[in-house]
Amino acid sequence: MTILVLFLSCAALASAECCSRGDAEVVISEWDQVFNAAMAGSSESAVGVAIFDAFFASSGVSPSMFPGGGDSNNPEFLAQVSRVVSGADIAINSLTNRATCDSLLSHLNAQHRAISGVTGAAVTHLSQAISSVVAQVLPSAHIDAWEYCMAYIAAGIGAGL
């Protein structure tokens, strides 16, 4: 019974307790394979555009809310994709150092508070899109670890939005 209560609490919260150090290490390793490995036909912008495509499909957020309107041939949109993917890279790679990660997430939260129209729900959808694309690129991805750790990141960035 105690294990069930603990499991349900963890699943409901998807918080720091759920993105354990082991989860974080798995996510960092798998992100490295997706983000940094030289995979044939894949690049940072291709992965980033796939993340945004998944985000637009699941969130209901209009591509027009972003520079370049979601056009994968538009340099303004590709610059936005690069900023988001780079931010995700830094956040993911800081997961094993919670003080650094929390400071970064607080900084990203402040940046997003200054942008009209950004919501916590949209941040959550984007984090889920990242997990979804990782699972597509890396079929052996540990999706539970991704869900826990991306929920932690989304909660930090999206707090109060």
UniProtKB/Swiss-Prot annotation:
Keywords for this entry? Disulfide bond, Heme, Iron, Metal-binding, Oxygen transport, Secreted, Signal, Transport
- Residue ranges occupied by any Globin domain in the UniProt entry: 18-161
| InterPro entries cross-referenced by the UniProt entry | Globin, Globin-like_sf, Globin/Proto, Haemoglobin_extracell, Mb-like_M
One Gene Ontology cellular component = extracellular region
Q: Does the keyword Signal apply?
A: yes
Q: Which PROSITE patterns match?
A: GLOBIN
Extent of the signal sequence: 1-16
Q: Which Gene3D superfamilies match?
A: Globins
Q: Where does heme b bind?
A: H112
> What terms describe the molecular function in GO for this protein?
heme binding; iron ion binding; oxygen binding; oxygen carrier activity
Disulfide bond entries: C19-C149
Q: Does the keyword Oxidoreductase apply?
A: no
Highest taxon listed in the record's lineage: Eukaryota
The record's subcellular locations are: Secreted
Q: How does it assemble?
A: The 400 kDa hemoglobin consists of a spherical 24-mer arranged as a double layer of dome-shaped dodecamers. Each dodecamer is composed of the 3-fold trimer of the tetramer A1-A2-B1-B2 having one intra-tetramer (A1-B2) disulfide bond and one inter-tetramer (B1-B2) disulfide bond per tetramer.
Any idea what job this protein has? Answer: The extracellular giant hemoglobin is able to bind and transport oxygen and sulfide simultaneously and reversibly at two different sites.
Q: Which family does it belong to?
A: Belongs to the globin family.
Q: What is the designated name of this protein? A: Extracellular giant hemoglobin major globin subunit B1
> From which organism does this entry originate?
Oligobrachia mashikoi
Q: What is the lineage of its organism?
A: Eukaryota, Metazoa, Spiralia, Lophotrochozoa, Annelida
